[in-house]
Every structure is written in C-alpha cells, then in structure tokens.
Amino acid sequence: MRSSRITLVLGGAVAVLAFAAGIALGAGNGLKRLNLPGAANRPFSHVVVDGGTIYVAGTLGLDAETGKPPADAKAEARLALDDIRRKLELAGATMDDLVWVQVFCPDLELYDEFNAVYRTYFEAGFPARSFVGSGPLLFGSRFEINAIAVGG
C-alpha cells in the first residue's frame, strides 16, 4: 500500500513538473507567427516558427483574382506549392528544407497529376509525405497541403 502511494505521489510530481515545463516553454518562448503580405484577417497564421521548426498548414491552390481553384488540377497543385514556397521563404527556408508534407485530396484519381507537379519543386530529395483521401475541401479545392520544415 505504501509503495503504491509513493508511486502515485511521484507520478503526480512528474506530471506537475512536466505541465509546468510545458507552460514555461509555451509562454514567451519566441514563437514567430508570420503571414503573407495582404493576407485577410483570418483566425490562423500562414506560418508558425518554433526554434528551427517551421509549420505551414491549410494551403490551398486558389487563383488570386477569383479566390477559386483553377479548372486544371495541375495548375491548382502549382498554385498551392508556389504558396508553400512563399510561406517558407517568409521563414528563411526553401522547399528543400521540408521534412514532412501531408496532402488532402477528395479525388484519389488525381494522385499522378499532383505528383507530376510536386516532383518539380525539389532538388535535394523529397520529404516524407502522405496523400490522404478526404471529403470536400474549402472553396471546391482539390488539394490542401500541410508541411513541416526544419532549418532555413
């Protein structure tokens, strides 16, 4: 019985210390939240930098004038990847700094079309990547991309 109380107390102490460390790391730790110029006031950042790790999420390939995806899937993939590139440049990184990419697509038949464009964006090898079948995406998009880069 005494052994389980000691274990419980030690476990609780470890949990409190871990929680306190998390708060200390999260409060004023130098997170940078970056947005492309002219971005609408939306409830998210285009890029978040934490130390040497760069996070980009929810990137769509929308036409700047219409706010909609172009008719051609490859053109949409190009717009989305160009947008990822611009966002990485905000943080001083390049496409070759990417270590992880996640692509959501409601039509898995577009896998080869996406890859034909995607492969042209890298010189130093490819990041780890998943291509995930999804439900409908915002604005009728065919692709939504999340990415993590290291370095820059």
Language-model segments: residues:
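N-terminal presequence-like segments and the immediate start of the first folded domain
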Residues: 4-82, 86-99, 104-152
